UniProtKB/Swiss-Prot annotation:
Keywords, ordered alphabetically: Glycoprotein, Hydrolase, Membrane, Metal-binding, Metalloprotease, Protease, Transmembrane, Transmembrane helix, Vacuole, Zinc
Residues exposed to the Cytoplasmic side: 1-24, 412-446, 496-508, 555-671, 730-736
Subcellular location: Vacuole membrane
Residues holding Zn(2+) 2: D186, E221, H319
Chain ranges passing through the membrane: 25-45, 391-411, 447-467, 475-495, 509-529, 534-554, 672-692, 709-729, 737-757
Cellular compartments per GO CC: vacuolar membrane
Membrane topology: Multi-pass membrane protein
Molecular-function GO terms, alphabetical: metal ion binding; metalloexopeptidase activity
Protein task: May be involved in vacuolar sorting and osmoregulation.
Parts of the chain on the Vacuolar side: 46-390, 468-474, 530-533, 693-708, 758-992
Keyword Transcription regulation attached: no
Annotated source species: Paracoccidioides brasiliensis (strain Pb03)
Protein known as: Vacuolar membrane protease
Length: 992
């Protein structure tokens, strides 16, 4: 007897069959391959080209040396080093311009060292709160490269001169850093990219068609001051589009952070290595991202249309001493520079009129009106961009067509009597006899598995939030590994248990149907948000649903390969009767275990098929045809199909396990088509969004924001990422799930017990020192999250023996703790004398009240500083700065009044003259924002503080308290600024 005859269920190995080994191997390979590509895109920066391969006019070696020089020290606006950087930039610009002037064919270049513009404005108010007023003096450097199609006249030299022709292109970067960071990525790389753009577009052969303005702005870190005061320069009326280069991380790839519209975003496709998603822009719209960039000024105030490109990770180095050249690399610099070159070249070469038509707002430049767009990169090599309205139309169409196609297909299946889905049994004519089809098996399996596999990761998110909430700060991928591994193992375990007890050939069809329903609902929600709120972050749901629809349709089309239900039932009934007659003639009736494999316990046939009745004396001599997907013929009620023993073995070998016997004609390869239709696009789009979201938010805990939203995102995106496995996972062998179970156990233990911070992923603690010049006392304050803030303070020698006064911080879970610290030495008698002046001499101020009116003039000046401010216990109604410009586009006051006036000067030890007037409102004693008791004054009096700021942290010993904190704080702590100044000194005042 041959082996096949000995074991009728032996089947030849088919490498693409829907059986455990091919399913496990192929699915694992597909997921790993695409996931690795997605991870490589996020973790590996494209290498910088060699000098020989660099674009003509670009010198990366020079750019890197410029970055090293720029980041030699801290250079905030209120520092001497900032003046040095300003002078160095002018020198570098002039050198590049001289080189281009010596070459033939170079464009005209004009350099504006803007030391005239100034502006008074405000933050516009928040709800009913008083606003903050600002006076700022410009030290911006503006470089204009005249385009070949620009107005040849120097129109900016005329009184009220305006440019003719098409608008130019603005590329912006700020050259100031924070007082605690060297500014390599925030925004040194942007600055040196501007220098290289200047070299590139002044090189022969690269002359721009439209004018290009390079803005080296100063003062972004303190209040976007540099961009706001740029609005007072003539060039702000010339530019219609912009590219803003920023940094909110410390390397990696430069990400397209946000964009004003579809039309301008299309120019980003010129970038050699595009990277970004519309998700980040919607984060700003929804208020999830609180920090801002110069983008809001260029677009919101001036009306320019453009792009915001920024480094986004790791945020633990952002605004710290690790934002330096040592912690980044030339590859990241090249990525930003290549993006800037590609995008800018496209903008300055554009000949259309999209950015030159009139706008409805007369206060803004005539840059036209754009359309909301959707954009995302694919593996950092390709870039997709299209209108949000287009996606809305496609989504609505698909929401209607998808269910309609499946409904029509279901009707066709019912008409041809092959709709096994939702079919429990089939009646034989009008008789009471029925044959079981077991078509409901697996109907509710997928929603149960989907629910459990979603709930468990969410439960783990709660667990991490309670036990070790900040582990994601340093171990994002450990959290991802935990979530993904538990999802796959639980899904496999539940699917295998269900398949063991109730095997079903319809598992795939039912799984896809449920996923179709869930993604249909997701697309409805996404479409509503896109239409009503302009939110495009759910763009991936369209592609997700489209792929699910196609995969589901394949499962429905597969059913056409099955025998007609009536035909199957008649054949099963006949065979049952013949076998029952044969069995009744035996002396001994066999037990259920002795029955043939195709006879169920109730006598019904388990493997009914048109071709499987045993030959008898009455059997026709002609064997009937097999019923297959490709070769099916209908017959009358008396038509009978017969098979040889060999055919019977083939049929039985085509049935997997104990699944329904009618399933033997189902195609065995279509699962691969479904996998390839759905899995890659889901991994690419969902994986991209998930990684971008968690990468940008993994370190928000140090800012006082709850990390639960990060863990919740990991949990939900795990479900979205691996839901395409549900139709196949019951076929997996135990090897991969068991391995993932071990991964889950290991990562769970690690995530629960590991210390969340490290020298490579430090916790940010925010520093400020406040000096009361009236009594000479000072307090050092650190702001951070507990219990790590207390651990840091306990390591500081000057805090030993003192009880720190801790209060609720400015946001979320932040706590602020203060103690009496080492006195600062920010003011000296003269540059050559180390003797520190008494604190009472640091600020000079004079207040003169207008007789009979609630008006006063305040003159204030600080030693060794160019930044001061006035804080009022009750808001003033209005204020004016002597010699300042005002702009109705940037109101300087509001109905709520002004609680604080910030004063910035380009001149050291400047004297500001501020006129204020206030309403006659009674003042009740209470607690001020900083905890100091308010003074009880009459309704015609005004009280407050005169404060000056010191931010220069380049010389050791000037701020001993900061030096001490940096020296003794744990290695896993990074010190960042808490406010505009590192040291703030104040006098109280009362105007009577």
């Amino acid at each position: 007897m041959s082996p096949a005859m000995a074991n009728p269920r032996v089947r030849k190995f088919n490498p693409i069959a829907f059986t455990p080994l091919p399913v496990t191997f192929i699915t694992t390979i597909v997921y790993l391959a695409v996931l690795i590509l997605v991870l490589v895109t996020y973790l590996v920066v494209p290498p910088a080209p060699t000098l020989e391969m660099s674009p003509k006019g670009v010198n990366l070696t020079e750019a890197w040396r410029d970055l090293q020089h720029l980041t030699e020290g801290f250079h905030p606006y209120n520092s001497r080093r900032n003046d040095d950087v300003h002078a160095w930039l002018l020198h570098r610009i002039e050198a590049i311009v001289r080189e281009s002037a010596s070459a033939d064919g170079g464009p005209e270049v004009f350099v504006f060292d803007d030391n005239l513009s100034n502006l008074t404005y405000s933050n516009g108010g928040v709800s009913k709160s008083p606003i903050v007023g600002v006076y700022f003096e410009s030290t911006n450097i503006i470089v204009y490269i005249r385009g070949s199609e620009d107005d040849p006249q120097n129109w900016w030299e005329w009184s009220n001169g305006k440019p003719k022709g098409k608008g130019g292109v603005l590329v912006n970067a700020h050259y100031d850093s924070v007082s605690t960071g060297y500014g390599a990525t925030d925004d040194g790389m942007g600055v040196v990219s501007l220098l290289q753009l200047l070299r590139y577009f002044t090189t022969a052969g690269n002359k721009p068609r439209k004018g290009l303005v390079l803005l080296f702005n100063n003062g972004e870190e303190d209040y976007l001051n540099g961009a706001r005061v740029y609005s007072q320069h003539a060039m702000s009326n010339f530019t219609h589009t912009f590219l803003n280069l920023e940094g909110a991380g410390a390397g990696g790839r430069a990400c397209l952070f946000r964009s004003t519209d579809t039309e301008v975003t299309r120019f980003y496709k010129n970038a050699k290595h595009p990277f970004g998603s519309v998700l980040a822009g919607d984060g700003f719209k929804l208020g999830l991202i609180r920090s801002q960039t110069d983008y809001v000024v260029f677009n919101g105030v001036l009306g320019l249309r453009g792009l915001d490109v920024s480094f986004i990770a790791p945020r633990s180095r952002y605004h710290t001493d690790q934002d330096d050249a040592r912690h980044t690399n030339v590859d990241s610099l090249w990525h930003m520079l290549s993006v800037a070159i590609g995008t800018t070249e496209g903008l300055v070469s554009y000949t259309g009129t999209d950015f030159d038509s009139k706008t409805t707002d007369q206060d803004k430049v005539n840059s036209g009106d754009g359309t909301l767009g959707i954009w995302f990169d694919i593996f950092g090599s390709a870039f997709a961009v299209f209108r949000l309205h287009t996606l809305f139309a496609l989504s609505v169409t698909l929401l209607v067509i998808g269910p309609l196609v499946l409904f029509i297909t279901s009707i066709a299946l019912s008409k041809t009597d092959r709709m096994y889905l939702f079919s429990m049994s089939k009646s034989l004519g009008g008789a009471s006899e029925t044959v079981s089809l077991r078509g409901l098996r697996g109907l509710f399996r997928t929603p149960i598995i989907l629910t459990v596999t979603t709930v468990i990761p969410i439960g783990l998110a709660y667990l991490l939030e309670k036990i070790n909430p900040y582990i994601v700060h340093s171990s994002q991928f450990a959290v991802w590994s935990m979530m993904l591994s538990v999802w796959i193992f639980v899904a496999w375990f539940l699917a295998r248990v269900a398949d063991f007890f109730r095997p079903s050939a319809l598992h795939r069809a039912y799984s896809y149907t449920w996923i179709f329903i869930v993604t249909w609902i997701m697309l409805v929600i996404s479409t509503v948000y896109a239409n009503q709120k302009g939110i495009a972050a759910g763009y991936f749901t369209f592609f997700y649903f489209a792929a699910v629809f196609l995969a589901t349709w394949v499962s429905y089309l597969e059913l056409f390969s099955l025998p007609r239900k009536g035909y199957y039932a008649r054949q099963a009934s006949r065979r049952q009767k013949r076998r029952s007659s044969s069995l009744s003639s035996r002396l001994l009736t066999p037990s259920a275990d002795e029955l043939p494999s195709d006879i169920g316990p109730n006598g019904a046939e388990n493997v009914g098929d048109p071709d499987e009745t045993d030959p008898t004396e009455s059997t026709s001599l002609l064997r009937g045809q097999r019923t297959t997907f490709a070769n099916y013929r209908t017959g009358g009620d008396d038509w009978v199909t017969e098979y040889t023993a060999e055919d019977e073995h083939v049929r039985e070998a085509s049935i997997f396990g104990h699944e329904q016997s009618w399933s033997w004609t189902l195609p065995r390869w279509t699962w691969i088509l479904q996998l390839l239709l759905l899995a890659p696009i889901v991994i690419i789009l969902v994986g991209q969004v998930g990684l971008l979201l968690t990468t940008a938010m993994s370190q928000i805990g140090s800012d006082g924001v709850s990390t639960f939203i990060v863990y919740l995102a990991c949990a939900l995106f795990s479900t979205l990422l691996f839901a395409p496995l549900l139709p196949f996972i019951h076929r997996f062998t135990y090897h991969v799930p068991t391995f993932l179970l071990l991964i889950f156990i290991g990562t769970l233990i690690y995530n629960l017990v590991a210390f969340p911070f490290s020298p490579a992923n430090r916790l940010k603690i925010f520093f400020i020192q406040e000096v009361n010049l009236d009594d000479g006392t000072n307090k050092v304050s650190l702001t951070g999250i507990q219990p790590y803030l207390t651990d840091t303070i306990n390591a500081i020698p000057s805090a030993a023996g003192q009880t720190a006064n801790c209060t609720q911080g400015p946001f979320g879970s932040l706590v602020r703790c203060s103690w009496s610290g080492l006195p600062p030495r920010v003011v000296k008698e003269d540059p050559g004398n180390d003797q520190t002046m008494g604190p009472y001499t640091w600020i000079s101020y004079n207040i003169t009240r207008t007789v009979g009116k609630n008006e006063a003039r305040i003159k204030v000046s600080g030693r060794n500083t160019r930044a001061c401010k006035l804080k009022f216990d009750n808001p003033v109604a209005d204020y004016r700065i002597s010699g300042s410009a005002v702009d109705h586009r940037l109101p300087h006051t509001s109905r709520q009044g002004v609680a604080e006036i910030r004063l910035w000067s380009r001149t050291w030890e400047n004297t500001w003259v501020v006129d204020v007037d206030w309403h006659s409102n009674p003042v009740n004693p209470g607690e001020s924002k900083d905890g100091d008791e308010k003074q009880d004054v009459s309704k015609n009096e005004l009280s407050g503080k005169v404060i000056c700021l010191w931010s220069d942290n380049n010389e050791s010993g000037v701020i001993p308290a900061l030096d001490e904190v940096r020296l003794y704080a744990p290695a896993w702590v990074a010190i960042s600024k808490s406010a505009d100044g590192l040291v703030e000194a104040s006098h109280d005042f009362i105007i009577q």
